[in-house]
């Protein structure tokens, strides 16, 4: 982990003093309630809801998310400051019913309460006092009925808000502009700031707000820690925050263990390791969350590009609706995946004795079946009797997923459940072929409209949660109790540094400097630079970064030329790259075996998508990963200090302080979680603050108060790193069969080749008269060697096309180890480029591993299978339902697989991916424990249709499975939606592109006279302006090859004197007639011996014969050509 930073360069020291939070009051008359509803977690009958903290919609522009909160005064003349950041969400509590619900289905609150009791989690217990009256916290002159009230609270003091220990001071109100509304905010200070005490009636408390926090925030934390006494957990978190008890064991007495743990042969160690891992997560996760964070650009709601073309509030709400639809696959994956982080159920220990897996013997497991089993406390006394659930015994196989399991995933919170249901409405159903189901209309008009429905009693069948559950029931995962070591799925924002091109971090030269003798002026041609250069070359050919063409091909000649130009650009870059590696003595054949795809998961809460669901998923993901990386550390400490019959709380009393102290150096920056430690100072001994004692009495004065920091060190998390090995190097026979490349030639080599998708795209352009499909036409050609020729077309051109496609496809099949069929020219170029590199590295036996992105695509479809579009209206019959939905459409989302994830990763995507954290020790006697976050696999057939086993490509099924060599990541780009695209600092002029194109032509054709091609390119780019080019113009355009200026000008003068049209085609035909084409002149060459220095002859006796191969003599002479001329 990095050393502590100085006070000048960390966000904590730069933050300003302020309160522990604010109460915001928004005028109902002008506040965009529908936009807030689309961002929030309202349900039918809600009294409080959560909304993301965003500048321009919930807080004012320029709001600082980092603050030094004044939270205590040990004496009247000294204040304590604590650096913290704000919580990601705000809580709307006053007049919350004015915000429309995001999901209109009734009965969610009662369902959540019943399910919470069924699973054994405690409900919220209100404080023995009434909620604060509006007059206690509303500023004078404001009508409480005309304003919406919400609380923005800091991370370090949210437990104080929950327990009613903050004080609102209305006299210190501030007027702020939130969007188009003139709003007011009132500061919240901790009651410890007032040494003389504050009457309880003046302390701000709202039972609905605290209940919402209990359900939407703290229950999820309790689930991640596998404790059921949520209220007690909040008390412990508050005590830890106030009294700085991070190194004291707290939650172990609250732990509960399933039967599989109690009955384990090594149950004592397993219970201790499980409890210790939870304690470490409780100690470190709050510290990481409350640390100061960078303010991302996506926090500025009023500048979201999403609203650029919106006119009026309806268009803005519709844009938000589409944006939410693009996030739906991430949320639905967490529900439909069997290995979702929401279903992580505990810690298990393998019974195997393999030494190589010692550090991986403890691992996180998941399974809904385990979550509803009975549990025992640390003293092995039963404490939860369990819940049978529907068919949980698995009489028909695994248990059935029920609505109660969905409520569990939503942390028994009606707010989160409503938001989950809203996202699930965008999902398409996948009907099982084994269980035929009635039509949606029949269900809505029949069973859903029955008074027997426990949720809506038949009054709102179209939007009832049971109806949504019925529509998607075949996609929910099975309920099992698994003890396997499988990946778990996490969701959140991607980091800014991802290496997801085909060869990942190959030759990035980071941490690979073995010696410090490298000259500073030596060029470092990295793999990243290679890809950038390739994109630049393609842009000169009129191909943008997404593979789109400026000029579409109009016939077979253009089609072939398009690919030949791309091939030439790729081959030129490959030669230059390989020469650079050889020149710098880089052992690329060894380095390619250890390259990885690298993805980063951002640990900044404010970088996460603006949605309370993603806040919940971020908290769960961080807590789970912290526990996972702590398991081998706890295991080793327990092995050195065995429990010997002690209960986990007893063992932790004697060992936790040492374990917690060492955890920071043992677990951070060891391969998965990166963080930095910052020292927070306040530059001045005093600061200007309001006189809070006077303000409490309604008088506003300022005073200069001496202050000091109550907490100096701050642990700031950065990223979680996930890797995927590119080149297969394992010995597992089953895996080897998935990666090994068959040596038999396939009959369908063309339709599986690199040109097939392009041949299909331009099928009507190439073959306007044929009625054959492109698939059949080219499959037929591979067998019968014949292609149709349109009437009036040149048979020679079509023969050249067929030979080009055939030859290129055969060559591709022989050398290809990247199992994709390119869909655009950028992917085609990168595939050719990387195949050439891998061939040079000798990697031709196995296919490489790929990461494919599943990118959401929203679409409007007929609403027949999406009853929620009807709202709360009644449905009398199936015919009435069909008529009502016949004219309506529903927004749904599907995912499309991308061949290469690198372009998506540049757009700052939201990602959902499965991760497995492996632990290992160093080499050469290094006994430190390192971790590696490896990309895993999704479990569950209902996650997405792209994850179902593909039957194979082509007309015949491919042998061998390809799923093991392809990993998938759900990715939603945010660039252009919530983050503005970067504009170029300087505009590129046309003349710059012309110059770059000419230099590229000359560089590629140094072996031949290139004046012919340069002139044709100039005529194509500049047209008639070529006639007036001066010598200075020609020298500028030719750049470092300006010596060709005279030849180019003479050729242009010849064209001008001929009077032909200034087009590339006319110029080419004219010059071919005059010169006979490029390189047509046949000059006589003589062989000239290359002189050798006298010193060399004297010292080595080396005599080199000159070559008669023209320019070949200028190339580097390799050893094989030098040895024959050696005379001793």
Curated annotation (Swiss-Prot):
Keywords: DNA replication, DNA-binding, Host nucleus, Virion, Virion tegument. Pfam families: Viral_DNA_bp. One of its GO terms (molecular function) is single-stranded DNA binding. It is found in: Virion tegument; Host nucleus. Residues 1104-1128 are annotated as: Required for nuclear localization. One of its GO terms (cellular component) is viral tegument. InterPro entries: DBP_sf, Viral_ssDBP_head, Viral_ssDNA-bd. The keyword DNA-binding applies. Its main location: virion. Homooligomers. Forms double-helical filaments necessary for the formation of replication compartments within the host nucleus. Interacts with the origin-binding protein. Interacts with the helicase primase complex; this interaction stimulates primer synthesis activity of the helicase-primase complex. Interacts with the DNA polymerase. Interacts with the alkaline exonuclease; this interaction increases its nuclease processivity. Plays several crucial roles in viral infection. Participates in the opening of the viral DNA origin to initiate replication by interacting with the origin-binding protein. May disrupt loops, hairpins and other secondary structures present on ssDNA to reduce and eliminate pausing of viral DNA polymerase at specific sites during elongation. Promotes viral DNA recombination by performing strand-transfer, characterized by the ability to transfer a DNA strand from a linear duplex to a complementary single-stranded DNA circle. Can also catalyze the renaturation of complementary single strands. This is Major DNA-binding protein. The lineage of its organism: Viruses, Duplodnaviria, Heunggongvirae, Peploviricota, Herviviricetes.
């Amino acid at each position: 982990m990095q050393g502590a930073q100085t006070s000048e360069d960390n966000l904590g020291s730069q933050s300003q003093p302020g309160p522990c939070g604010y109460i915001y009051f928004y005028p109902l008359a002008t506040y965009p309630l529908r936009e807030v509803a689309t961002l929030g977690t309202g349900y039918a009958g809600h009294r409080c809801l959560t909304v993301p903290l965003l500048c321009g919609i919930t807080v004012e522009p320029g709001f600082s998310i980092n603050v030094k909160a004044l939270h205590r005064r040990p004496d009247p003349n000294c204040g304590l400051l604590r650096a913290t950041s704000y919580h990601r969400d705000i809580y709307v509590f006053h007049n919350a019913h004015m915000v429309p619900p995001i999901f209109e289905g009734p009965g969610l609150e009662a369902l959540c309460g019943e399910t919470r009791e069924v699973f054994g989690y405690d409900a919220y217990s209100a404080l023995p006092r009434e909620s604060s009256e509006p007059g206690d916290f509303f500023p004078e002159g404001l009508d409480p009925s005309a304003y919406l009230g919400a609380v923005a609270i800091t991370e370090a003091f949210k437990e104080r808000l929950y327990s009613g220990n903050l004080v609102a001071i209305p006299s210190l109100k501030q007027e702020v502009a939130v969007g188009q509304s003139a709003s007011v905010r009132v500061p919240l200070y901790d009651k410890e700031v007032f040494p003389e005490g504050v009457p309880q009636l003046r302390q701000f408390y709202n039972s609905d707000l605290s209940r919402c926090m209990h359900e939407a925030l703290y229950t999820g934390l309790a689930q991640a820690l596998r404790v059921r006494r949520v209220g007690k957990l909040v008390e412990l978190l508050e005590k830890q925050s106030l009294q700085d008890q991070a190194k004291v064991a707290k939650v172990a007495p609250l732990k509960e263990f399933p039967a599989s743990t109690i009955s384990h042969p090594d149950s004592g160690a397993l219970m201790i390791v499980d409890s210790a891992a939870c304690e470490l997560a409780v100690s470190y996760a709050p510290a990481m969350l409350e640390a100061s964070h960078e303010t991302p650009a996506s926090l500025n709601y009023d500048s979201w590009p999403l609203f650029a073309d919106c006119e009026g509030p309806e268009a803005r709400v519709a844009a938000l609706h589409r944006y939410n639809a693009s996030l739906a696959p991430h949320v639905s994956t967490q529900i439909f995946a069997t290995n979702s982080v929401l279903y992580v159920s505990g810690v298990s220990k393998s019974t195997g004795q393999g030494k190589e897996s010692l550090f991986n013997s403890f691992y996180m497991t998941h399974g809904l079946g385990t979550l509803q089993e009975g549990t025992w406390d640390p003293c092995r006394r039963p404490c939860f009797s369990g819940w049978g659930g529907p068919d949980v015994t698995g009489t028909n196989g695994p248990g059935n997923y029920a609505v109660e399991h969905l409520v569990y995933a939503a942390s028994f919170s009606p707010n989160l459940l409503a938001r989950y249901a809203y996202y699930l409405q965008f999902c398409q159903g996948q009907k099982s072929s084994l269980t035929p189901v009635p039509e949606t209309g029949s269900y809505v008009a029949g069973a859903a409209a029955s008074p027997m429905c426990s949720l809506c009693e038949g009054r709102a069948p179209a939007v009832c949660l049971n109806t949504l559950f019925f529509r998607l029931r075949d996609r929910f995962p099975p309920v099992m109790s698994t003890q396997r070591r499988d990946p778990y799925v996490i969701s959140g924002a991607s980091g800014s540094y991802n290496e997801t091109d085909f060869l990942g971090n190959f030759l990035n030269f980071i941490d690979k400097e073995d010696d410090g003798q490298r000259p500073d002026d030596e060029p470092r041609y990295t793999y990243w630079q290679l890809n950038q250069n390739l994109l630049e070359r393609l842009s000169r050919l009129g191909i943008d970064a997404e593979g789109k063409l400026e000029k579409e091909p109009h016939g077979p000649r253009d089609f072939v030329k398009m690919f030949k130009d791309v091939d030439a650009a790729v081959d030129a870059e490959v030669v230059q790259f390989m020469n650079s590696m050889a020149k710098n003595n880089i052992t690329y054949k060894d380095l390619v075996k250890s390259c990885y795809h690298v993805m980063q998961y951002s640990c900044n809460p404010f970088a996460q998508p603006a949605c309370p669901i993603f806040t919940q998923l971020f908290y769960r993901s961080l807590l789970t990963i912290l526990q996972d990386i702590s398991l081998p550390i706890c295991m080793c400490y327990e092995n050195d200090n065995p429990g010997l019959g002690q209960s986990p709380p007893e063992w932790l009393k004697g060992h936790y302080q040492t374990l917690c102290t060492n955890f920071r150096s043992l677990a951070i920056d060891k391969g998965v979680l990166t963080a930095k430690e910052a020292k927070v100072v306040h530059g001045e001994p005093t600061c200007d603050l309001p006189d809070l004692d006077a303000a409490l009495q309604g008088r506003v004065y300022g005073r200069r108060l001496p202050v000091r920091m109550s907490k100096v060190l701050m642990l700031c998390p950065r990223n979680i790193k996930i890797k995927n090995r590119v080149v297969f190097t394992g010995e597992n026979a089953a895996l080897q069969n998935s990666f090994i490349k068959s040596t038999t030639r396939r009959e369908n080599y063309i339709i599986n080749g690199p040109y097939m998708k392009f041949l299909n795209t331009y099928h009507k352009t190439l073959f306007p008269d044929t009625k054959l499909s492109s698939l059949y036409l080219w499959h037929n050609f591979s067998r019968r060697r014949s292609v149709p020729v349109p009437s009036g077309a040149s048979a020679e051109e079509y023969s050249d096309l067929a030979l080009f496609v055939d030859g290129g496809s055969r060559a591709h099949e022989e050398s290809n180890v990247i199992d994709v069929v390119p869909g655009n020219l950028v992917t085609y170029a990168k595939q050719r480029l990387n195949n050439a590199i891998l061939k040079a590295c000798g990697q031709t036996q196995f296919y490489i591993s790929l990461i494919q992105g599943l990118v959401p695509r929203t679409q409007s479809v007929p609403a027949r299978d999406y009853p929620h579009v009807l709202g709360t209206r009644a449905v009398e019959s199936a015919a009435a339902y069909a008529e009502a939905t016949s004219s309506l459409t529903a927004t749904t989302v599907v995912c499309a697989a991308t061949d290469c994830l690198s372009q998506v990763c540049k757009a700052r995507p939201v990602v959902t991916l499965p991760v497995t954290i492996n632990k290992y020790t160093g080499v050469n006697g290094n006994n430190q424990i390192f971790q590696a976050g490896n990309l895993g696999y999704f479990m569950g057939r209902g996650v997405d249709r792209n994850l179902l086993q593909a039957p194979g490509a082509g007309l015949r099924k491919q042998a061998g499975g390809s799923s093991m060599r392809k990993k998938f990541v759900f990715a939603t780009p945010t660039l252009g939606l919530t983050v503005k695209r970067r504009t170029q600092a300087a505009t590129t002029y046309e003349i710059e592109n012309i110059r770059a194109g000419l230099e590229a032509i000359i560089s590629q054709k140094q072996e031949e006279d290139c004046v012919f091609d340069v002139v044709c390119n100039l005529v194509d780019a500049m047209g008639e302006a070529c006639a007036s080019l001066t010598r200075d113009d020609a020298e500028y355009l030719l750049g470092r090859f300006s010596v060709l200026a005279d030849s180019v000008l003479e050729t242009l003068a010849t064209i001008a004197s001929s009077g032909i049209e200034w087009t590339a085609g006319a110029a080419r035909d004219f010059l071919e007639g005059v010169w006979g084409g490029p390189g047509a002149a046949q000059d006589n060459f003589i062989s000239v011996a290359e002189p050798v220095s006298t010193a060399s002859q004297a010292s080595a006796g080396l005599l080199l014969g000159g070559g008669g191969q023209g320019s070949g003599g200028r190339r580097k002479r390799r050893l094989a050509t030098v040895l024959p001329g050696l005379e001793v």
